[in-house]
Amino acid sequence: MRLFLSLPVLVVVLSMVLEGPAPAQGAPDVSSALDKLKEFGNTLEDKAWEVINRIKQSEFPAKTRDWFSETFRKVKEKLKINS
């Protein structure tokens, strides 16, 4: 008797599993995926500009530029002396 009850239950469960997800649970809409991608791109752009502006405002680029200028000037002077 148990076998007669468990087989129909098993068939119903198996048919529900094989039927697949409901349309609301299916793949998300393409436009929503594109909106999420656009939002991610905008966020990434904002963060990149923030980092670039922070680097421009720091004194590291100025010190680096001065160091390269000074080093280049010294090399130029040494080449003039040796010539």
Swiss-Prot record:
Keyword DNA-binding: no
Main location, first listed in the record: secreted
Any GO CC annotation of this UniProt entry: very-low-density lipoprotein particle
Gene Ontology BP terms: cholesterol efflux; cholesterol metabolic process; chylomicron remnant clearance; lipoprotein metabolic process; negative regulation of cholesterol transport; negative regulation of fatty acid biosynthetic process; negative regulation of lipid catabolic process; negative regulation of phosphatidylcholine catabolic process
Pfam families: ApoC-I (PF04691)
GO molecular function: fatty acid binding; phospholipase inhibitor activity
Localization (cell): Secreted
InterPro entries named in the record: ApoC-1_sf (IPR043081), ApoC-I (IPR006781)
Signal sequence, renumbered to the chain: 1-26
Keywords assigned: Lipid transport, Lipoprotein, Secreted, Signal, Transport
Family label: Belongs to the apolipoprotein C1 family.
Role noted for this protein: Inhibitor of lipoprotein binding to the low density lipoprotein (LDL) receptor, LDL receptor-related protein, and very low density lipoprotein (VLDL) receptor. Associates with high density lipoproteins (HDL) and the triacylglycerol-rich lipoproteins in the plasma and makes up about 10% of the protein of the VLDL and 2% of that of HDL. Appears to interfere directly with fatty acid uptake and is also the major plasma inhibitor of cholesteryl ester transfer protein (CETP). Binds free fatty acids and reduces their intracellular esterification.
Misc. comment: Apolipoprotein C-I is present in acidic (APOC1A) and basic (APOC1B) forms in P.paniscus, P.abelii and P.troglodytes and perhaps also in baboons and macaques. The two genes for ApoC-I arose through a duplication process that occurred after the divergence of New World monkeys from the human lineage. In human, the acidic form has become a pseudogene sometime between the divergence of bonobos and chimpanzees from the human lineage and the appearance of the Denisovans. Pseudogenization resulted when the codon for the penultimate amino acid in the signal sequence was changed to a stop codon.
Protein name, as recorded: Apolipoprotein C-I, basic form
